[in-house]
């Protein structure tokens, strides 16, 4: 990928992460279904780092402080990278992921969010 600034497609993200894996495949866990859960757990760990920034620095700092914002965005990228590793473990393509994303978006655009919220109002806390 060149140094020029551009947006990446889901396929780009998957391709870049696969290239990074190929470079380090002798040091990293394999990209196979057996190891997919590990990559998912790593992404959760990175989510924890995002949460820590929010808790320690606050929402305003993420919006207004360039250094805090850069750190937060880097953690977001870490989450995405580990999710791309997980997805690669299952050989899910960018096209599959894009199609699923668009389909979910379209369902959510038609969804009655008020109805969804009210259906859980009578459920006691801590119950499924």
What is each model feature region?
Residues 1-128:
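Flexible "arm" and connector segments at domain edges
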């Amino acid at each position: 990928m060149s140094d020029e600034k551009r947006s990446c497609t889901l396929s780009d993200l998957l391709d870049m992460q696969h290239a990074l894996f190929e470079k380090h495949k002798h040091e990293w866990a394999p990209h196979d279904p057996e190891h997919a859960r590990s990559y998912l757990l790593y992404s959760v760990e990175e989510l924890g780092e995002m949460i820590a920034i929010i808790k320690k620095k606050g929402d305003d700092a993420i919006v207004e402080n360039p250094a805090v914002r850069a750190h937060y965005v880097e953690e977001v990228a870490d989450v995405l990278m580990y999710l791309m590793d997980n997805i690669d473990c299952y050989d899910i393509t960018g096209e599959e992921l894009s199609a699923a994303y668009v389909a979910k978006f379209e369902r959510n655009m038609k969804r009655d969010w008020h109805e969804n919220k009210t259906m859980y109002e009578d459920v006691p806390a801590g119950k499924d």
